[in-house]
A protein has these predicted regions:
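C-terminal effector-binding regulatory domain of bacterial HTH transcription factors
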Residues: 246-254, 264-336
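Short beta-strand-centered segments that line the small-molecule binding cleft or hinge
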Residues: 87, 110-114, 132-168, 172, ...
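A short LG(V/I)-centered, amphipathic sequence patch enriched
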Residues: 41-61
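Central regulatory/effector-binding core of bacterial HTH transcription factors
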Residues: 92-154, 224-225
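Hydrophobic/proline-rich hinge and linker segments of small-molecule sensing/allosteric domains
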Residues: 159-200, 268-278, 293-297
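Beta-alpha-beta core module
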Residues: 155-162, 166, 229-278
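Secondary-structure junction motif
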Residues: 179-180, 185, 194-215, 281-290, ...
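Short helix-boundary/capping micro-motifs
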Residues: 12-29
């Protein structure tokens, strides 16, 4: 068994069992991958794939277990490489982050600018997507960190560090009926209007939908997007009432939009940073955490980096005073 065989195995799985696509991604040939997979199956004496002719149609039960072990082995190999790099080239490397548009557009620019000043030789990679897409990148071992809000159930293999809280805001055109009578903003009134919000808010497990469900209300979500700028555009068009993160509200937006803090209508949500539980964090990775979540002292970051369960991380975070991100919402009225 070789690392190349495991790499080919994971490449095929991560490309939907399409050997041609995997070969293109791995810069090798389709026959070469097929040969290596057959050799791997013969060596371990187990059928990894169910086949129909020359096509792979599914992983066998044994194959599913083997893929899980292969991912762990490749992560362990990467950890060994990271340790070697840490000892020989502490100021060089790559930091790969998967996150949402809101974090990438409104939160990370200042932090990544500071990080780049400290580590100019560290290459930065930023992947944007939904929580589900971020989870897929994590599962494929393609990123160092995941940054998202809610959706913790999608990341059972990560240690998740709570970083900051935020409360949703409600956006309308300035001539909207809710803007004229903002003092009486309630979930019941919101449910009377078409709503425009984030894709993840349409997940049945989201605190957004649960808030309405707790009041036996059915919101009229007519449009969802990953991008807060897109949501604001459609609010301006009159498609619906927007519900977005406060970090995405710019002061210029208030020239033609009415904004109302929805604290009390919806639960406060927490943005977290996560990394694989068995990952060796290089020093520059720990320093990024310190920049993104400065309320986490260095000694707690060290403990979180080696914590064997999320319960341990949650215990470490118990006494932390999480900051609240407000963007340009300071001074906005709060919903009644």
């Amino acid at each position: 068994m070789t690392l190349k065989q495991l790499k080919y195995l994971l490449g095929v799985v991560d490309n939907g069992l399409n050997i041609t696509s995997a070969a293109d991604r791995l810069y090798t040939s389709q026959p070469g991958i097929s040969k290596q997979l057959r050799q791997l199956e013969r060596e371990i004496g187990v059928t990894i794939f169910s086949r129909k002719g020359k096509s792979l149609v599914a992983l066998t039960p044994a194959g599913q277990t083997i893929v899980q072990l292969a991912r762990k082995i490749t992560r362990d190999v990467e950890n060994i490489r990271s340790l070697g790099k840490e000892l020989t080239a502490e100021q060089e490397g790559t930091l790969s982050i998967a996150t949402t548009h809101t974090q990438a557009r409104y939160v990370l620019p200042e932090i990544l600018s500071q990080f780049h000043e400290r580590y100019p030789n560290v290459k930065l990679e930023l992947h944007q997507g939904t929580s589900e897409q971020i989870a897929a990148l994590v599962a494929e071992n393609k990123v160092d960190f995941a940054i998202a809000t809610e959706s913790r159930e999608l990341f059972p293999e990560l240690n998740l560090l709570p970083c900051f809280d935020w409360d949703r805001i409600v956006l309308t055109p300035q001539d909207h009926v809710l803007a004229a009578d903002a003092d009486c903003l309630t979930l019941a009134r919101l449910a009377e209007h078409p709503l425009v919000t984030y894709v993840f808010s349409s997940n049945r497990e989201s605190s957004f939908l649960k808030a309405f469900a707790d009041e036996n209300l059915e919101p009229k979500v007519v449009f969802t997007a990953r991008d807060a700028d897109v949501i604001k555009t459609y609010v301006r068009m009159g498609m619906g009432v927007g519900v977005i993160a406060p970090m995405a509200l710019l002061c210029d937006d208030l020239k033609d939009l009415n904004a109302r803090c929805a604290k009390g209508l919806f639960p406060t949500v927490t943005t977290w940073l996560g990394f694989p539980r068995d990952k060796v964090l290089r020093q520059y990775m720990k320093e990024f955490i310190a920049l993104f979540a400065p309320h986490w002292p260095d000694y707690l970051i060290e403990q979180a980096a080696t914590a064997e369960s999320q319960e341990i991380v949650d215990k470490l975070a118990e006494d932390l005073d999480l900051p609240t991100r407000t963007g340009c919402t300071k001074g906005l009225a709060v919903a009644a």
